């Protein structure tokens, strides 16, 4: 679907009339769940997940058949500051790896039965160094938001967004600090594996960006423009498109959560259609999830990004939906006690 906005004002307007969860589907799913051949509440959180999914899909007996994993790749000007353990050219190399089917995300998509798309966002033209100037112009931000919006398959019934971009945990840390408050050190982690003096340098970069753009940080979209990256903006655009289309979303790690947090800062209901697939080993991720009110499904010590933790969670949600829709009721099974 072509993005319905050509400016940041147009993107903001999207959030003025967001669709709501289908209350009738929630009621039907809840009623069905109460009659299934199990003790009430015996499936724990799976029951809540299934009912949540039913409400956003709009079907009291839903199916999960067409999950989409949308990966966005962008390069960052701050990568030249040595904030990552890897050089900027790795972004392009990893995109080639995705297309060849050789990355972890490819294997996890196959196991989860998910389609995978990869959107490259001007990889030959990094964002600007946000310690010197805003990372993006307004037009560049709008283009990235639109690219994310248009990458969502209207036929999908679940969306996971992932990212590739050397330097993007630095941008995510800056976004989180700007939106949530606190110091650069509280939000800056090891990312690709930096430690010691390299981590100190990364933290200084975040602090410098926050100081330079202090006057702009009261506006979530200005936070994204000044401190973010094209792939982070595209993830926000994709999550917004899913919200408008009532497509459920599983959020991934710290970078994805920072993108989602921009939407949450615009209006908290912007993430009603989203759950957190996991909590990552990136140190600030638990705090970021708490700030947007999301409880993770998994804690596996993962810190790869690229949507991987959320993809692992797809089959948990699929299991929940299968139980709600596939189990027999007490009456159907002829079992006493219902």
UniProtKB/Swiss-Prot annotation:
Q: Which residues form the active site?
A: 306
Which InterPro entries does this entry report, sorted A to Z? Nict_dMeBzImd_PRibTrfase, Nict_dMeBzImd_PRibTrfase_bact, Nict_dMeBzImd_PRibTrfase_N, Nict_dMeBzImd_PRibTrfase_sf
What GO biological process terms does the UniProt entry carry, in alphabetical order?
Answer: cobalamin biosynthetic process
Q: What is its EC number?
A: 2.4.2.21
Alphabetically ordered keywords of this record: Cobalamin biosynthesis, Glycosyltransferase, Transferase
Q: Which reaction does it catalyse?
A: 5,6-dimethylbenzimidazole + nicotinate beta-D-ribonucleotide = alpha-ribazole 5'-phosphate + nicotinate + H(+)
- MF terms in GO: nicotinate-nucleotide-dimethylbenzimidazole phosphoribosyltransferase activity
Q: Which residues form a coiled coil?
A: none
Kindly tell me the pathway this chain contributes to.
Answer: Nucleoside biosynthesis; alpha-ribazole biosynthesis; alpha-ribazole from 5,6-dimethylbenzimidazole: step 1/2
Report the family membership.
Belongs to the CobT family.
Tell me, what does this protein do in biology?
Catalyzes the synthesis of alpha-ribazole-5'-phosphate from nicotinate mononucleotide (NAMN) and 5,6-dimethylbenzimidazole (DMB).
The record's listing under NCBIfam families reads:
cobT_DBIPRT, PRK00105.1
Q: What is the name of the protein in this document? A: Nicotinate-nucleotide--dimethylbenzimidazole phosphoribosyltransferase
